[in-house]
Each structure stands twice: as structure tokens, then as C-alpha cells.
Amino acid sequence: MRVADFDYPLPEERIAKYPPLQRGSTRLLVICREGGTVSHARYRELDTFLRKGDLLVLNNTRVVKARLMAEKSTGAAIELMLLEKHGQEQSLVLFRGRVKQGDRLRSHGHEFLVEEIVDHGVARLSLPEGRSIQPVFEAHAEVPIPPYLRRPAEPVDRERYQTVFAEHAGSVAAPTASLNMTPELLLRLRDGGVETSSITLHVGLGTFLPIRVDSMEEHVMHREFYSIPAATIEKIRATKASGGRIIALGTTVTRALEHAALSLSGHSGPGPLEGEADIFIYPGCSFRLIDALLTNFHAPRSTVLMLTAAFAGPDLLRRAYREALDKEYRFLSYGDSTLIL
């Protein structure tokens, strides 16, 4: 299947550059796979589409401060995005600007050495004497809002580019389907008999790297660590046994659950089920665990768009996106959402 089949025109004015004034006040496009219908609602009305016995699974990862400005010896500005640790003394970063192996980059009194160019726009950095890079980012970096917002991080992003249930630090991007969720809506869902439970998946490099091949089958996904607590596994089993639905709040939850699906049945004991999700879900793939998906509107040619198309069906999703653009929905991280039933 061709990557180009998942391109579409996204006008700049349809990209939400800032969060809504009030969390949860966004719109919700509802896609019904069985009837092939598209309808319109508000995110705060999510509880009217779920029912007693359903299980809503959340990703409780917390976004870390990961965006740091540095400069070369020439004075040229370089933007660094911390992606992950590479051993104990080196880290992978996504960079914007001209950088080569051996360059030295200065920021806030520290000098990083570019050890290696790993991929297009990805480098491995170190500090002198084997010191860890993480404390420098923790002290001086900003919230890593997406580059397509075309603006620096602002105070509003510190709160709003984080979910209300963020707990375990480790992501370099938010699980954006959850940004519109509010404590009040979660309470209404629970009062209506909808169970909730959490997993942790730390969003990493794969979120930022574009697909550079023509055929989906050739694309290799980056690994992302996940942890599914034993309590969540038990809730999933109980929900399935009673005929309830597993509602994935976002593509990160979907990837973690679908990657772990074959291991869940045999997992026992008090400890979590942990792994590294490296599956690329695109049309033609089957889903073993999730029954519904709440997610955002995704960028053209992105892996998360392809995952969403795999779940909704490519033709139905294209029709839904066209309708959303016609009705001026807000797209991408700070935008509106879709519920696929």
C-alpha cells in the first residue's frame, strides 16, 4: 500500500495553533463503522456514546521538558529535541539546523559534542567527562510543543500540553487525544458505569520522524516503551468476558494494547506487562483488543493517520476528514477529536 494514498490537503488555517480557552470545549466527530455514518457532537458529550460496562483505557505518561536552543561555534542557532537516553552517558536528539559529527554545541554554559549523526535530523550527543545530558534539559529546556505550530512554547503550554492525569515522566510529545479530557468528564463516565484504567507508553522518536519510503510495508517503526499494570490487565479481561467494549483513548494506547495482545492472556502475577511497541498498524492489519478509538485529527502521511484508517476503514475515514474540513474542525494536537465506534 502506498504512503501517498494517505496524503490530503490540510490548510494552515485548519491547524489549531493554541489550545481552546477551556479544556474539553472542543468538537467531536463521531464515526460509526457499522453504519458508515458520520455525525457531530462535542467532546464533553463523550459519555453519551459510551455505556455501562465499557472500559476506557488512558495513557498516563507525562511530557518532559525536552526542547532546548543551542548554538554552534559560528553562532548559528540549533534547536535540539531530547528523544531518549542512549546508554548512560549519551542521548539521542532531534536537531533543526546544519550539524555534523564532531561539532560542538553550546547552551546555558554547557558544551555538547555531536558524537554521531544517526539519521536524517537525529544525532547522538554527549557532555564532557561522561556527564548526563538529562539534567541540562530539565533545568533549561522548554515544553516540546510540535514544530508545526510554528511558534515558541508559551506559559499556556506548560499546563495545556499535559493531560490532567499525567503521572509518569518520559514522553517528548503528549498523548494528544487526552488533552481535551477533564476530571468532570471522567467523573460522569464513571458515574455512568464506564470503567477507566491506565497504561504508560512514553512517546518518542517515532512521533517526529517522517515516513521516507513509498510503500508502507517498507517503513520501520521506532520502539516505544510501555507498561500495562496488572490491575489494567484484569479489567481488560473482565470487560471482554462481560461483553463490554475496550475504548482506547488515543493511538498510543492502541499501539501498546495491540502490541501486548498476544501476551495478555498468559500474563499473571502482581507485576506489570512491559515491552517496546514497534508495530506499524496500517490498513489491512487486524485489531485484537480495542473496540473503539478516541483520537485527534492527524497530519497527512503520518503513521497515526494510517493507524486510524486501519481501524475506521480508509474510505470512511477519507469521507469523515473531508466533512471535518468542510465544517471547519480544528486539526492536530490542540484541535478537535474523532470517536470511531
Curated annotation (Swiss-Prot):
The keyword Transferase applies. GO terms for molecular function: S-adenosylmethionine:tRNA ribosyltransferase-isomerase activity. It catalyses: 7-aminomethyl-7-carbaguanosine(34) in tRNA + S-adenosyl-L-methionine = epoxyqueuosine(34) in tRNA + adenine + L-methionine + 2 H(+). It is an enzyme of class 2 (transferase). GO terms for cellular component: cytoplasm. One of its GO terms (biological process) is queuosine biosynthetic process. Its main location: cytoplasm. Belongs to the QueA family. This is S-adenosylmethionine:tRNA ribosyltransferase-isomerase. The gene is queA.
